[in-house]
């Protein structure tokens, strides 16, 4: 079984404070095997993390702002447009695989 945190924000997100490197260091210190960086409406934190040498599996993800609230999308490589109706956003995520 993997010890995983699937909802982490970095300073690439409007509400995150820790750099990507700080997040990865904290994940290692906490004994996590995997994390998903799910910054708001951007995948920049994930893109930075995938370039770093780390023992933590970094799952691609994003927290998408919709008209009705937020949706977490995992396993996609590009973020869909934000600010859309939630059902349209879910469809866009499904279409990305």
Language model segments and positions:
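An N-terminally biased module of ancient metal coordination in phosphate/nucleic-acid-related enzymes
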Residues: 1-68, 87
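Histidine/acidic residue-rich metal-binding segments in metalloenzymes
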Residues: 48, 83-96
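Glycine-centered loop/turn motif at secondary-structure junctions
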Residues: 31, 96-97
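Short, low-complexity, polar/charged sequence segments that are solvent-exposed and flexible
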Residues: 22-25, 77-80, 91-94
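Glycine/small-residue-rich loop that forms an oxyanion/phosphate-binding "nest" at active or ligand-binding sites
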Residues: 59, 72-83
């Amino acid at each position: 079984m993997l010890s995983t945190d699937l909802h982490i924000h970095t300073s690439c997100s409007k509400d995150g404070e820790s750099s990507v490197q700080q997040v990865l260091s904290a994940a290692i210190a906490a004994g996590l095997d995997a994390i998903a960086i799910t910054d708001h409406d951007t995948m920049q934190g994930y893109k930075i993390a995938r370039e770093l040498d780390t023992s933590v599996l970094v799952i691609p993800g994003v927290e998408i702002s919709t008209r009705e609230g937020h949706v977490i999308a995992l396993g996609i490589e590009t973020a869909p447009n934000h600010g859309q109706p939630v059902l349209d956003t879910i469809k866009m995520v499904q279409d990305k695989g």
